[in-house]
Amino acid sequence: MNLLIDTHVLLWWLDDHPTLSQKAKDAIADGKKLVFISAVVIWEIRIKQKLGKLEIPNNFRKVLDSQPFEQLDITVEHAHAVGDLPTHHCDPFDRMLVAQTKVEHLTLVTRDIRLKKYKIPIIEA
């Protein structure tokens, strides 16, 4: 199954951070699966950067573009799916990732175990 990676997973992957689990690293590097980055992940990163909660390098876009990731835009169908989710979790970025995981039949790579309540496929990061 193809993958959708959460914000912290993307940042850990790009930084080769030891916090990222070997299982997650292997799944992302597999080469047999498509790995998607949602527009909501970039949106969250840029908001946190603007608020001073996150530092990203000046060449972040170039570094990201050099990765073999597919872009996943936010669609009207995704937005409707967010509205259909139970309120197990209130973070709007995570809720969109859950909706996209469901609609697009993906596996979410995340460290956030609260998202398991949505009964979606997850690889723990």
Residue ranges of model-derived segments:
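Short, well-structured N-terminal submotif of metal-dependent ribonuclease cores
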Residues: 1-37, 50-62, 104, 113-117
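Acidic catalytic patch
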Residues: 61-88
